[in-house]
Amino acid sequence: MSLNIQNLTLNLGKKTILNNVSLHVKDGERVGLVGSSGSGKSMLLRAATGLLPFETKISGSCMLGGVQTVGASDENLARIRGKYVGVVFQQANRALNPMLSVEEQISLPLRIHYQLDADDVHNRVCAMLEKVGLPQNIISKRTFELSGGQLQRVGIATALITSPRLILADEPTTALDSVTQKDVVNMLTSLVDNMGASMLFVTHDFSVLSRAAKRCYVLDSGRLVDSAEVQDLLENPRVTSTKQLVDAAKKLTLRAQKLDSQNVSSENVTSENVTSESASSENVSSENASRKDSSLLTAKNIHVTLGRALARAEVLKGVDLDLFKGESLAIIGGSGSGKTTLIRAMLGLQKISDGIVTYDSQIVNSSTNRKKISDYSALRKETSLVFQHPFAALDPRWTVLKSVAEPLNIWRKSLQLDDATICNRVEEMLQLVGLNPKDFLERYPHELSGGQAQCVAIARALINNPRVLLADEPMSAIDVAERTRILDAFAAIRKERPTMSCIFVSHDLGMIQHLATRVIVLNDGKIVEFGRVSDVLNSPQNDYTRALVNAAIM
Protein backbone atom coordinates (compact mmCIF):
# COMPACT_ATOMS: atom_id res chain seq x y z
CA MET A 1 0.00 0.00 0.00
CA SER A 2 1.31 3.43 -0.90
CA LEU A 3 1.29 6.53 1.30
CA ASN A 4 0.93 9.90 -0.39
CA ILE A 5 0.88 13.08 1.72
CA GLN A 6 0.40 16.45 0.01
CA ASN A 7 0.57 19.94 1.56
CA LEU A 8 -0.29 18.66 5.03
CA THR A 9 -0.57 21.42 7.65
CA LEU A 10 -1.34 20.73 11.29
CA ASN A 11 -2.12 23.29 13.98
CA LEU A 12 -2.52 22.65 17.69
CA GLY A 13 -3.95 25.79 19.24
CA LYS A 14 -1.83 28.69 18.02
CA LYS A 15 1.18 26.48 17.30
CA THR A 16 1.91 25.05 13.85
CA ILE A 17 3.11 21.45 14.26
CA LEU A 18 3.39 20.56 10.55
CA ASN A 19 3.76 23.13 7.80
CA ASN A 20 2.92 22.19 4.20
CA VAL A 21 4.49 18.72 4.36
CA SER A 22 4.54 16.50 1.26
CA LEU A 23 6.03 13.01 1.01
CA HIS A 24 5.30 9.67 -0.59
CA VAL A 25 6.05 6.01 0.02
CA LYS A 26 5.63 3.70 -2.96
CA ASP A 27 4.02 0.29 -2.74
CA GLY A 28 6.62 -2.14 -1.33
CA GLU A 29 9.13 0.63 -0.50
CA ARG A 30 10.89 1.29 2.81
CA VAL A 31 11.35 5.02 3.46
CA GLY A 32 12.86 6.82 6.45
CA LEU A 33 11.75 9.99 8.21
CA VAL A 34 14.41 11.55 10.42
CA GLY A 35 14.38 14.66 12.57
CA SER A 36 15.18 16.02 15.99
CA SER A 37 12.90 15.58 18.96
CA GLY A 38 9.83 17.80 18.67
CA SER A 39 10.18 18.23 14.90
CA GLY A 40 6.73 16.71 14.31
CA LYS A 41 7.64 13.17 13.23
CA SER A 42 5.20 11.36 15.52
CA MET A 43 2.42 13.86 14.79
CA LEU A 44 2.86 13.17 11.08
CA LEU A 45 2.18 9.47 11.67
CA ARG A 46 -0.80 10.29 13.88
CA ALA A 47 -2.16 12.59 11.19
CA ALA A 48 -1.82 9.83 8.60
CA THR A 49 -3.96 7.46 10.69
CA GLY A 50 -6.38 9.99 12.16
CA LEU A 51 -5.06 9.63 15.72
CA LEU A 52 -4.97 13.35 16.50
CA PRO A 53 -6.07 15.34 19.55
CA PHE A 54 -9.62 16.67 19.30
CA GLU A 55 -8.51 20.33 19.21
CA THR A 56 -6.16 19.79 16.24
CA LYS A 57 -6.84 21.59 12.96
CA ILE A 58 -5.62 19.80 9.84
CA SER A 59 -5.59 20.65 6.13
CA GLY A 60 -4.09 19.04 3.06
CA SER A 61 -4.26 15.49 1.78
CA CYS A 62 -3.19 12.09 3.09
CA MET A 63 -3.92 9.07 0.91
CA LEU A 64 -3.48 5.54 2.28
CA GLY A 65 -3.73 3.55 -0.91
CA GLY A 66 -6.87 5.04 -2.40
CA VAL A 67 -8.40 6.18 0.90
CA GLN A 68 -8.35 9.83 1.98
CA THR A 69 -7.81 9.97 5.76
CA VAL A 70 -7.99 13.75 6.23
CA GLY A 71 -11.57 14.44 7.18
CA ALA A 72 -12.50 10.75 7.23
CA SER A 73 -14.95 9.53 9.86
CA ASP A 74 -13.78 7.51 12.85
CA GLU A 75 -15.80 4.56 11.55
CA ASN A 76 -13.99 4.53 8.21
CA LEU A 77 -10.58 5.01 9.84
CA ALA A 78 -11.26 2.13 12.25
CA ARG A 79 -11.71 -0.21 9.27
CA ILE A 80 -8.21 0.69 8.04
CA ARG A 81 -6.21 0.87 11.25
CA GLY A 82 -4.87 -2.47 12.39
CA LYS A 83 -6.04 -4.30 9.26
CA TYR A 84 -4.39 -2.52 6.33
CA VAL A 85 -2.13 -0.18 8.30
CA GLY A 86 -0.04 -1.39 11.23
CA VAL A 87 1.54 1.07 13.66
CA VAL A 88 4.60 0.32 15.80
CA PHE A 89 4.50 2.96 18.52
CA GLN A 90 7.51 4.73 20.02
CA GLN A 91 7.31 3.40 23.57
CA ALA A 92 5.87 -0.09 23.71
CA ASN A 93 5.42 0.06 27.49
CA ARG A 94 2.90 2.89 26.99
CA ALA A 95 1.26 1.50 23.85
CA LEU A 96 0.53 -1.96 25.28
CA ASN A 97 -2.30 -2.62 27.72
CA PRO A 98 -0.88 -3.81 31.08
CA MET A 99 -4.15 -5.64 31.79
CA LEU A 100 -3.77 -7.93 28.78
CA SER A 101 -1.54 -10.97 28.38
CA VAL A 102 0.86 -11.15 25.44
CA GLU A 103 -1.56 -13.42 23.57
CA GLU A 104 -4.53 -11.13 24.21
CA GLN A 105 -2.48 -8.10 23.14
CA ILE A 106 -1.17 -9.54 19.87
CA SER A 107 -4.49 -11.13 18.93
CA LEU A 108 -6.50 -7.94 19.47
CA PRO A 109 -6.35 -6.72 15.82
CA LEU A 110 -7.31 -10.21 14.63
CA ARG A 111 -10.34 -10.35 16.91
CA ILE A 112 -11.44 -6.86 15.85
CA HIS A 113 -11.15 -7.31 12.08
CA TYR A 114 -11.71 -11.04 11.49
CA GLN A 115 -14.13 -13.74 12.60
CA LEU A 116 -11.74 -16.50 13.73
CA ASP A 117 -12.12 -19.33 16.22
CA ALA A 118 -9.96 -19.44 19.35
CA ASP A 119 -7.63 -22.17 18.08
CA ASP A 120 -6.90 -20.32 14.85
CA VAL A 121 -6.15 -17.10 16.74
CA HIS A 122 -3.87 -18.94 19.17
CA ASN A 123 -1.96 -20.64 16.34
CA ARG A 124 -1.46 -17.33 14.51
CA VAL A 125 -0.17 -15.66 17.67
CA CYS A 126 2.28 -18.53 18.28
CA ALA A 127 3.50 -18.28 14.68
CA MET A 128 3.98 -14.52 15.02
CA LEU A 129 5.90 -14.93 18.29
CA GLU A 130 8.30 -17.22 16.46
CA LYS A 131 8.70 -14.72 13.62
CA VAL A 132 9.62 -11.88 15.99
CA GLY A 133 12.02 -14.07 17.96
CA LEU A 134 10.07 -14.48 21.20
CA PRO A 135 9.74 -17.75 23.16
CA GLN A 136 6.34 -19.39 23.46
CA ASN A 137 6.50 -19.35 27.27
CA ILE A 138 5.82 -15.59 27.42
CA ILE A 139 2.39 -15.95 25.83
CA SER A 140 0.57 -15.64 29.16
CA LYS A 141 2.81 -12.92 30.61
CA ARG A 142 1.90 -9.26 30.96
CA THR A 143 3.87 -6.16 30.04
CA PHE A 144 5.47 -5.59 33.44
CA GLU A 145 7.05 -9.05 33.24
CA LEU A 146 8.89 -8.31 29.98
CA SER A 147 12.16 -6.58 29.16
CA GLY A 148 12.34 -3.55 26.88
CA GLY A 149 13.39 -5.63 23.89
CA GLN A 150 10.60 -8.13 24.47
CA LEU A 151 8.05 -5.32 24.79
CA GLN A 152 9.14 -3.85 21.48
CA ARG A 153 8.89 -7.23 19.77
CA VAL A 154 5.38 -7.70 21.17
CA GLY A 155 4.49 -4.26 19.78
CA ILE A 156 5.84 -5.25 16.36
CA ALA A 157 3.99 -8.57 16.49
CA THR A 158 0.74 -6.72 17.31
CA ALA A 159 1.25 -4.38 14.34
CA LEU A 160 2.04 -7.20 11.89
CA ILE A 161 -0.39 -9.93 13.01
CA THR A 162 -2.96 -9.01 10.33
CA SER A 163 -0.31 -8.79 7.56
CA PRO A 164 -1.01 -5.09 6.88
CA ARG A 165 0.00 -3.49 3.59
CA LEU A 166 1.63 -0.43 5.20
CA ILE A 167 3.74 -0.25 8.38
CA LEU A 168 4.25 3.04 10.22
CA ALA A 169 7.14 2.51 12.64
CA ASP A 170 7.64 5.32 15.17
CA GLU A 171 11.08 5.03 16.80
CA PRO A 172 10.79 1.22 17.12
CA THR A 173 14.31 0.82 18.55
CA THR A 174 14.23 3.57 21.18
CA ALA A 175 15.90 2.54 24.48
CA LEU A 176 17.19 -0.79 23.12
CA ASP A 177 20.81 -1.93 23.32
CA SER A 178 22.91 -2.03 20.15
CA VAL A 179 22.59 -5.78 19.60
CA THR A 180 18.82 -5.73 20.18
CA GLN A 181 18.49 -2.63 17.95
CA LYS A 182 20.25 -4.40 15.13
CA ASP A 183 18.20 -7.57 15.61
CA VAL A 184 14.88 -5.69 15.81
CA VAL A 185 15.60 -3.63 12.68
CA ASN A 186 16.74 -6.71 10.75
CA MET A 187 13.70 -8.65 11.94
CA LEU A 188 11.26 -5.83 11.12
CA THR A 189 12.65 -5.14 7.65
CA SER A 190 12.73 -8.85 6.85
CA LEU A 191 9.09 -9.33 7.88
CA VAL A 192 7.99 -6.23 5.96
CA ASP A 193 9.81 -7.39 2.82
CA ASN A 194 8.43 -10.93 3.11
CA MET A 195 4.89 -9.54 3.35
CA GLY A 196 5.50 -7.25 0.38
CA ALA A 197 4.40 -4.30 2.50
CA SER A 198 5.52 -0.66 2.53
CA MET A 199 7.08 1.01 5.56
CA LEU A 200 7.66 4.56 6.80
CA PHE A 201 10.40 4.27 9.43
CA VAL A 202 10.62 7.22 11.82
CA THR A 203 13.80 7.73 13.83
CA HIS A 204 16.36 10.25 15.03
CA ASP A 205 19.22 7.75 14.73
CA PHE A 206 21.04 7.68 11.39
CA SER A 207 22.91 4.50 12.33
CA VAL A 208 19.56 2.70 12.66
CA LEU A 209 18.09 4.43 9.61
CA SER A 210 20.88 3.18 7.34
CA ARG A 211 19.75 -0.39 8.05
CA ALA A 212 16.01 0.26 7.75
CA ALA A 213 15.58 2.37 4.60
CA LYS A 214 17.27 3.44 1.39
CA ARG A 215 15.48 6.75 0.91
CA CYS A 216 14.85 9.37 3.57
CA TYR A 217 13.08 12.65 4.36
CA VAL A 218 14.39 15.13 6.94
CA LEU A 219 11.87 17.01 9.09
CA ASP A 220 12.84 20.15 11.00
CA SER A 221 10.39 22.27 13.04
CA GLY A 222 7.43 20.87 11.14
CA ARG A 223 8.90 21.43 7.67
CA LEU A 224 10.47 18.97 5.26
CA VAL A 225 13.91 20.42 4.60
CA ASP A 226 15.71 17.61 2.78
CA SER A 227 15.19 14.31 0.99
CA ALA A 228 17.66 11.94 -0.64
CA GLU A 229 19.12 8.46 -0.50
CA VAL A 230 20.22 7.66 3.07
CA GLN A 231 23.82 7.09 2.00
CA ASP A 232 23.89 10.45 0.21
CA LEU A 233 22.61 12.23 3.32
CA LEU A 234 25.29 10.58 5.45
CA GLU A 235 28.12 11.39 3.06
CA ASN A 236 27.01 14.78 1.71
CA PRO A 237 24.39 16.50 3.89
CA ARG A 238 23.25 19.65 2.10
CA VAL A 239 20.99 21.32 4.66
CA THR A 240 22.16 22.73 7.99
CA SER A 241 19.74 20.69 10.11
CA THR A 242 20.69 17.50 8.25
CA LYS A 243 24.37 18.24 8.71
CA GLN A 244 23.86 18.80 12.44
CA LEU A 245 22.10 15.45 12.83
CA VAL A 246 24.73 13.61 10.79
CA ASP A 247 27.68 15.26 12.56
CA ALA A 248 26.17 14.52 15.97
CA ALA A 249 25.49 10.90 14.96
CA LYS A 250 29.09 10.42 13.84
CA LYS A 251 30.41 12.01 17.02
CA LEU A 252 28.31 9.74 19.22
CA THR A 253 28.80 6.53 17.26
CA LEU A 254 31.63 4.06 17.69
CA ARG A 255 34.07 4.00 14.80
CA ALA A 256 35.80 0.89 13.52
CA GLN A 257 39.26 2.46 13.59
CA LYS A 258 40.66 0.73 16.70
CA LEU A 259 38.50 -2.37 16.97
CA ASP A 260 40.85 -5.17 15.96
CA SER A 261 39.09 -7.98 17.80
CA GLN A 262 37.34 -10.75 15.89
CA ASN A 263 33.86 -10.10 14.60
CA VAL A 264 31.17 -11.78 16.66
CA SER A 265 27.59 -11.66 15.42
CA SER A 266 24.77 -11.19 17.87
CA GLU A 267 23.20 -14.42 16.64
CA ASN A 268 26.15 -16.44 17.99
CA VAL A 269 26.22 -14.83 21.42
CA THR A 270 24.47 -16.79 24.17
CA SER A 271 24.83 -17.05 27.90
CA GLU A 272 26.57 -20.41 27.40
CA ASN A 273 29.60 -18.94 25.62
CA VAL A 274 29.91 -15.98 28.00
CA THR A 275 32.06 -16.63 31.05
CA SER A 276 33.13 -14.52 33.96
CA GLU A 277 36.81 -15.15 33.23
CA SER A 278 36.95 -12.09 30.99
CA ALA A 279 35.83 -9.98 33.93
CA SER A 280 39.28 -10.22 35.48
CA SER A 281 41.48 -7.18 35.01
CA GLU A 282 44.61 -6.79 37.10
CA ASN A 283 45.02 -3.11 36.31
CA VAL A 284 41.50 -2.17 37.33
CA SER A 285 41.49 -4.50 40.33
CA SER A 286 44.67 -3.03 41.78
CA GLU A 287 43.43 0.49 41.13
CA ASN A 288 40.13 -0.26 42.85
CA ALA A 289 41.88 -1.84 45.82
CA SER A 290 43.73 1.41 46.47
CA ARG A 291 40.45 3.34 46.40
CA LYS A 292 38.36 1.20 48.76
CA ASP A 293 38.41 3.89 51.40
CA SER A 294 36.66 6.28 48.99
CA SER A 295 33.88 3.87 48.05
CA LEU A 296 30.52 5.61 48.46
CA LEU A 297 28.02 3.03 47.21
CA THR A 298 28.90 -0.66 47.39
CA ALA A 299 27.12 -3.86 46.36
CA LYS A 300 28.44 -7.25 47.45
CA ASN A 301 27.31 -10.62 46.07
CA ILE A 302 23.91 -9.30 44.97
CA HIS A 303 21.36 -11.93 43.99
CA VAL A 304 17.82 -11.05 42.93
CA THR A 305 15.13 -13.62 42.17
CA LEU A 306 11.84 -12.57 40.61
CA GLY A 307 8.60 -14.30 39.70
CA ARG A 308 6.13 -16.66 41.27
CA ALA A 309 6.99 -19.98 42.90
CA LEU A 310 6.55 -22.06 39.74
CA ALA A 311 8.20 -19.54 37.42
CA ARG A 312 11.02 -17.94 39.38
CA ALA A 313 14.01 -16.48 37.57
CA GLU A 314 17.34 -15.33 38.97
CA VAL A 315 17.86 -11.88 37.50
CA LEU A 316 21.13 -11.03 39.28
CA LYS A 317 23.68 -13.74 40.05
CA GLY A 318 26.31 -12.59 42.49
CA VAL A 319 27.12 -9.05 41.31
CA ASP A 320 29.84 -7.01 43.05
CA LEU A 321 30.10 -3.28 42.43
CA ASP A 322 31.89 -0.28 43.96
CA LEU A 323 31.05 3.33 43.12
CA PHE A 324 33.79 5.68 44.28
CA LYS A 325 33.47 9.31 45.27
CA GLY A 326 33.56 11.57 42.22
CA GLU A 327 33.53 8.65 39.79
CA SER A 328 31.44 8.16 36.66
CA LEU A 329 30.65 4.48 36.16
CA ALA A 330 28.76 2.98 33.22
CA ILE A 331 26.74 -0.23 33.29
CA ILE A 332 26.05 -1.66 29.86
CA GLY A 333 24.36 -4.81 28.66
CA GLY A 334 21.60 -6.16 26.51
CA SER A 335 17.90 -5.89 27.18
CA GLY A 336 17.00 -8.09 30.14
CA SER A 337 20.58 -8.40 31.40
CA GLY A 338 19.68 -7.03 34.85
CA LYS A 339 20.94 -3.43 34.60
CA THR A 340 17.81 -1.71 35.91
CA THR A 341 17.30 -4.35 38.62
CA LEU A 342 20.85 -3.74 39.84
CA ILE A 343 20.46 0.01 40.33
CA ARG A 344 17.05 -0.49 41.96
CA ALA A 345 18.67 -2.92 44.39
CA MET A 346 21.42 -0.40 45.13
CA LEU A 347 18.80 2.20 46.05
CA GLY A 348 16.84 -0.18 48.26
CA LEU A 349 13.95 -0.18 45.78
CA GLN A 350 14.32 -3.89 44.99
CA LYS A 351 14.35 -6.69 47.54
CA ILE A 352 17.45 -8.87 47.19
CA SER A 353 17.63 -12.61 47.86
CA ASP A 354 21.30 -12.53 48.86
CA GLY A 355 24.03 -9.96 49.39
CA ILE A 356 24.37 -6.53 50.95
CA VAL A 357 24.34 -2.90 49.76
CA THR A 358 25.98 -0.07 51.71
CA TYR A 359 25.85 3.69 51.22
CA ASP A 360 28.47 5.77 52.98
CA SER A 361 29.30 2.69 55.12
CA GLN A 362 25.65 2.29 56.21
CA ILE A 363 23.61 -0.78 55.23
CA VAL A 364 20.72 0.17 52.92
CA ASN A 365 19.75 -3.24 51.52
CA SER A 366 20.33 -6.70 52.94
CA SER A 367 19.00 -10.20 52.45
CA THR A 368 19.70 -11.49 55.95
CA ASN A 369 18.04 -9.11 58.37
CA ARG A 370 16.16 -6.09 57.08
CA LYS A 371 15.96 -4.72 60.63
CA LYS A 372 19.68 -3.97 60.39
CA ILE A 373 19.07 -1.54 57.56
CA SER A 374 19.95 2.01 58.53
CA ASP A 375 17.72 5.03 58.10
CA TYR A 376 16.95 5.56 54.40
CA SER A 377 16.69 9.35 54.71
CA ALA A 378 20.33 10.08 53.84
CA LEU A 379 20.25 7.75 50.84
CA ARG A 380 16.97 9.15 49.53
CA LYS A 381 17.98 12.77 50.11
CA GLU A 382 21.46 12.50 48.61
CA THR A 383 20.74 10.29 45.60
CA SER A 384 18.68 10.89 42.47
CA LEU A 385 17.40 8.49 39.84
CA VAL A 386 16.60 9.22 36.20
CA PHE A 387 14.08 6.59 35.16
CA GLN A 388 14.21 4.80 31.82
CA HIS A 389 10.74 5.79 30.62
CA PRO A 390 10.14 9.51 31.24
CA PHE A 391 6.40 9.50 30.53
CA ALA A 392 5.87 6.71 33.04
CA ALA A 393 7.93 8.64 35.60
CA LEU A 394 6.13 11.99 35.19
CA ASP A 395 2.72 12.52 36.78
CA PRO A 396 0.34 13.34 33.89
CA ARG A 397 -1.62 15.69 36.21
CA TRP A 398 1.42 17.83 37.06
CA THR A 399 2.97 20.67 35.11
CA VAL A 400 6.67 20.66 34.29
CA LEU A 401 7.21 23.21 37.07
CA LYS A 402 5.63 20.97 39.70
CA SER A 403 7.38 17.82 38.44
CA VAL A 404 10.88 19.32 38.39
CA ALA A 405 10.34 21.02 41.76
CA GLU A 406 9.14 17.81 43.45
CA PRO A 407 12.48 16.87 45.12
CA LEU A 408 12.86 20.39 46.54
CA ASN A 409 9.28 20.41 47.81
CA ILE A 410 9.89 17.13 49.63
CA TRP A 411 12.92 18.51 51.45
CA ARG A 412 11.96 22.20 51.49
CA LYS A 413 11.74 22.44 55.29
CA SER A 414 15.25 21.13 55.89
CA LEU A 415 16.59 23.14 52.95
CA GLN A 416 14.66 26.28 54.00
CA LEU A 417 13.41 27.11 50.51
CA ASP A 418 10.51 29.37 49.57
CA ASP A 419 8.37 29.19 46.43
CA ALA A 420 10.30 31.90 44.59
CA THR A 421 13.65 30.18 45.19
CA ILE A 422 12.27 26.84 44.07
CA CYS A 423 10.85 28.37 40.88
CA ASN A 424 14.20 30.00 40.10
CA ARG A 425 15.99 26.67 40.60
CA VAL A 426 13.54 24.96 38.26
CA GLU A 427 14.17 27.58 35.58
CA GLU A 428 17.94 27.12 35.96
CA MET A 429 17.65 23.35 35.55
CA LEU A 430 15.42 23.63 32.49
CA GLN A 431 17.88 26.00 30.85
CA LEU A 432 20.70 23.61 31.70
CA VAL A 433 19.02 20.76 29.80
CA GLY A 434 18.12 23.00 26.88
CA LEU A 435 14.45 23.80 27.53
CA ASN A 436 13.16 27.38 27.54
CA PRO A 437 11.39 27.91 30.89
CA LYS A 438 8.88 30.34 29.37
CA ASP A 439 7.74 27.66 26.93
CA PHE A 440 7.76 24.63 29.23
CA LEU A 441 7.01 25.58 32.86
CA GLU A 442 3.24 25.25 32.47
CA ARG A 443 3.17 22.33 30.05
CA TYR A 444 1.90 18.87 30.94
CA PRO A 445 3.64 15.59 29.97
CA HIS A 446 1.22 14.87 27.11
CA GLU A 447 2.30 18.17 25.53
CA LEU A 448 5.96 17.08 25.40
CA SER A 449 7.87 15.05 22.84
CA GLY A 450 9.82 12.01 24.00
CA GLY A 451 13.08 13.95 24.10
CA GLN A 452 11.54 16.90 25.92
CA ALA A 453 10.04 14.59 28.56
CA GLN A 454 13.46 13.00 29.07
CA CYS A 455 15.02 16.45 29.53
CA VAL A 456 12.41 17.26 32.20
CA ALA A 457 13.23 14.01 34.00
CA ILE A 458 16.95 14.82 33.97
CA ALA A 459 16.29 18.34 35.29
CA ARG A 460 14.23 16.89 38.15
CA ALA A 461 17.03 14.48 39.08
CA LEU A 462 19.67 17.22 39.19
CA ILE A 463 17.74 19.93 41.02
CA ASN A 464 18.61 18.78 44.55
CA ASN A 465 22.40 18.66 43.92
CA PRO A 466 22.71 14.91 44.63
CA ARG A 467 25.88 13.24 45.86
CA VAL A 468 25.01 10.23 43.71
CA LEU A 469 23.18 10.33 40.38
CA LEU A 470 21.89 7.06 38.93
CA ALA A 471 20.63 7.41 35.38
CA ASP A 472 18.77 4.52 33.75
CA GLU A 473 19.01 5.12 30.00
CA PRO A 474 18.95 8.93 30.50
CA MET A 475 19.10 9.73 26.78
CA SER A 476 17.20 6.85 25.24
CA ALA A 477 14.40 9.05 23.86
CA ILE A 478 16.56 11.99 22.80
CA ASP A 479 17.81 12.59 19.28
CA VAL A 480 21.53 12.77 18.58
CA ALA A 481 21.60 16.57 18.36
CA GLU A 482 19.99 16.92 21.78
CA ARG A 483 22.33 14.28 23.22
CA THR A 484 25.35 16.45 22.54
CA ARG A 485 23.69 19.30 24.44
CA ILE A 486 22.88 17.01 27.37
CA LEU A 487 26.44 15.69 27.33
CA ASP A 488 27.70 19.26 27.55
CA ALA A 489 25.31 19.83 30.46
CA PHE A 490 26.59 16.74 32.28
CA ALA A 491 30.17 17.88 31.65
CA ALA A 492 29.40 21.31 33.12
CA ILE A 493 27.71 19.73 36.12
CA ARG A 494 30.63 17.39 36.76
CA LYS A 495 33.05 20.31 36.53
CA GLU A 496 30.93 22.29 38.99
CA ARG A 497 30.44 19.30 41.31
CA PRO A 498 33.59 17.16 40.99
CA THR A 499 32.71 15.03 44.02
CA MET A 500 29.33 13.90 42.64
CA SER A 501 29.34 10.19 41.77
CA CYS A 502 27.39 8.92 38.78
CA ILE A 503 26.17 5.59 37.48
CA PHE A 504 24.98 5.64 33.89
CA VAL A 505 23.00 2.64 32.70
CA SER A 506 23.01 2.67 28.93
CA HIS A 507 22.76 0.57 25.81
CA ASP A 508 24.47 3.32 23.80
CA LEU A 509 28.19 2.56 23.66
CA GLY A 510 28.87 5.78 21.78
CA MET A 511 27.46 7.72 24.71
CA ILE A 512 29.34 6.04 27.53
CA GLN A 513 32.71 6.92 26.03
CA HIS A 514 31.78 10.56 26.80
CA LEU A 515 30.00 9.94 30.12
CA ALA A 516 32.09 7.47 32.10
CA THR A 517 35.65 6.52 32.93
CA ARG A 518 34.94 2.94 34.02
CA VAL A 519 32.46 0.42 32.63
CA ILE A 520 30.82 -2.83 33.73
CA VAL A 521 29.30 -5.21 31.18
CA LEU A 522 26.31 -7.25 32.39
CA ASN A 523 24.93 -10.31 30.65
CA ASP A 524 22.34 -12.72 32.04
CA GLY A 525 22.69 -11.21 35.51
CA LYS A 526 26.47 -11.59 35.72
CA ILE A 527 29.40 -9.23 35.19
CA VAL A 528 31.27 -10.59 32.18
CA GLU A 529 33.76 -7.76 31.68
CA PHE A 530 34.85 -4.55 33.36
CA GLY A 531 37.59 -1.98 33.07
CA ARG A 532 38.34 1.46 31.74
CA VAL A 533 35.91 2.55 29.04
CA SER A 534 38.61 3.03 26.41
CA ASP A 535 40.08 -0.42 27.07
CA VAL A 536 36.75 -2.25 26.98
CA LEU A 537 35.47 -0.49 23.84
CA ASN A 538 38.72 -0.68 21.88
CA SER A 539 39.78 -4.18 22.95
CA PRO A 540 36.80 -6.14 24.26
CA GLN A 541 37.86 -9.48 25.72
CA ASN A 542 34.46 -11.13 25.94
CA ASP A 543 32.33 -12.45 23.07
CA TYR A 544 29.24 -10.70 24.36
CA THR A 545 31.05 -7.35 24.68
CA ARG A 546 32.42 -7.76 21.15
CA ALA A 547 28.89 -8.32 19.86
CA LEU A 548 27.67 -5.13 21.56
CA VAL A 549 30.59 -3.13 20.16
CA ASN A 550 30.32 -4.52 16.63
CA ALA A 551 26.58 -3.89 16.50
CA ALA A 552 27.14 -0.26 17.54
CA ILE A 553 29.74 0.56 14.87
CA MET A 554 28.44 2.98 12.24
What are these regions (language model features)?
Residues 161-165, 463-467:
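A short, proline-enriched helix->beta-strand linker immediately N-terminal to the Walker B motif
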Residues 69-86, 104, 112, 232-237, ...:
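ABC ATPase NBD coupling module
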Residues 57-68, 355-367, 379:
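Conserved ABC transporter NBD signature motif
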